[in-house]
Design a protein with these regions (language model features):
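Amphipathic terminal alpha-helices
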Residues: 303-327
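Glycine/proline-rich active-site loop of Rossmann-fold NAD(P)-dependent oxidoreductases
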Residues: 156-159, 171-197, 215, 237-249
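NAD(P)H-binding glycine-rich loop region in Rossmannoid oxidoreductase-like domains
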Residues: 40-42, 50-88
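Conserved C-terminal active-site "lid" loop/helix of NAD(P)H-dependent oxidoreductases
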Residues: 227, 260, 278-298, 319-321
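Catalytic helix-loop patch of NAD(P)-dependent Rossmann-fold dehydrogenases
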Residues: 121-163
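N-terminal Rossmann NAD(P)H-binding glycine-rich loop of SDR-like oxidoreductase domains
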Residues: 3-26
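Conserved Rossmann-fold NAD(P)-dependent oxidoreductase catalytic core, especially the SDR/UDP-sugar
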Residues: 92-137
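Mid/C-terminal beta-alpha module of Rossmann-like enzyme folds, strongest
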Residues: 221, 231-279
């Protein structure tokens, strides 16, 4: 088994490669890591190729002898690059794979941005049969285009592909910093933009967290997945190619994160205060039943564990927080 990992230096890529290399199920597997902005070290089981998936020659070289592709490379809110990566890059990958004599399975890690994340009011849980509803911006649109391109290759060529649709992916202290009123906030909303500036500074100083509310003052439920659970789903997909072929799976926690429960738990366990913040966003519930049924996969990181892991995580001097992309 020879596995190409695009976006290999990201949080999912690095975790996935590490798990493959230590798993007894993949002891004969080798990795080709396609890197762009950052780099990895080559080993006897990892070959590193530097370049862009938008370049056909780079893709052709990276896919030589490949049996499986784990496609993680993506763009956030970068209009100048998003179509090169999302459309052109994915097209070259799919074209080269379908003509390859060694290729067996293509795994796309998509995003629930293709379903609107928490921008739209879905009256029922979001399943894999619901139509695409991208929220404003080029990133969400790119997630729709990825899924549609893979789906059409499955129709056109009976292409052996699987889409794993993930919501916001957490690792290390990501969740803690997603609740910061400071300029160090991870992702969105940017909480300090939703309150008075002086209040935001005081909340940040005190360690107070936001309790996100919808337009009716009800705590919002928002979908997340821990990187460990996503990696497990990726490996389950490789090991279960028959039920996975041609399918899309929601890969997420069993229940969305309830910001009301987050506030209660952090107050109870760490005496952390919260302040309600009214927003334009909506509660959603991403349904992962299909992945449980067909892949025999189940997430292990619960709400309380997600919180505890994030607050307990200690960074050393070589592990500074850095955001590699806008959006």
């Amino acid at each position: 088994m020879r596995i190409l990992v695009t976006g290999a230096t990201g949080k999912v890529g690095q975790s996935c490669i590490a798990e493959i290399l230590q798993s007894s199920n993949f002891e004969n597997a080798s990795i080709v890591a396609l890197c762009h902005n950052r780099n990895l070290n080559s080993t006897n089981r990892i070959k590193v190729i530097k370049g862009s998936i938008a370049d056909q020659n780079t893709v052709t070289a990276a896919l030589e002898g490949i049996t499986h592709v784990i496609h993680l490379a993506t763009c956030k809110e970068t209009p100048e690059a998003v179509m090169d990566v999302t459309v052109k890059g994915l097209f070259w990958l799919l074209e080269e794979c379908r003509q390859s004599s060694t290729f067996e399975h293509f795994i796309l890690v998509g995003g629930d941005a293709s379903m609107g994340h928490f921008f739209y009011d879905h009256s029922i849980p979001v399943t894999e049969t619901q139509r695409h509803t991208a929220y404003p911006g080029c990133y969400a649109l790119s997630k729709v285009l990825e899924e549609v391109m893979l789906e059409q290759y499955q129709i056109q060529y009976d292409f052996p592909g699987t889409c794993l649709r993930a919501p916001w992916i957490m690792e290390k202290d990501d969740f803690k910093f997603s609740l910061s009123f400071g300029k160090d906030v991870f992702g969105g909303p940017v909480w300090r933009d939703l309150v008075d500036e002086n209040e935001a500074d005081q909340y940040h100083k005190d360690g107070t967290i936001p309790l996100m509310l919808d337009s009716k003052d009800v705590p919002i439920k928002r979908n997340f997945v821990h990187v460990d659970d996503l990696v497990t789903a990726i490996l389950c997909t490789i090991l279960n190619p028959v039920p996975a072929k041609g399918q899309t799976f929601n890969i997420c926690m069993d229940e969305p994160v309830d910001y009301g429960q987050v506030s209660k738990y952090l107050k109870k366990t760490r005496n952390i205060e919260s302040v309600p913040v009214k927003t334009k966003y909506c509660s959603t519930w991403l349904d992962n039943t299909k992945a449980k049924f067909l892949l025999d996969w189940s997430p292990e990181v619960s709400l309380h564990e997600l919180i505890d892991r994030s607050w307990n995580y200690l960074r050393d001097g070589e592990d500074a927080r850095k955001i590699w992309y806008p959006g």
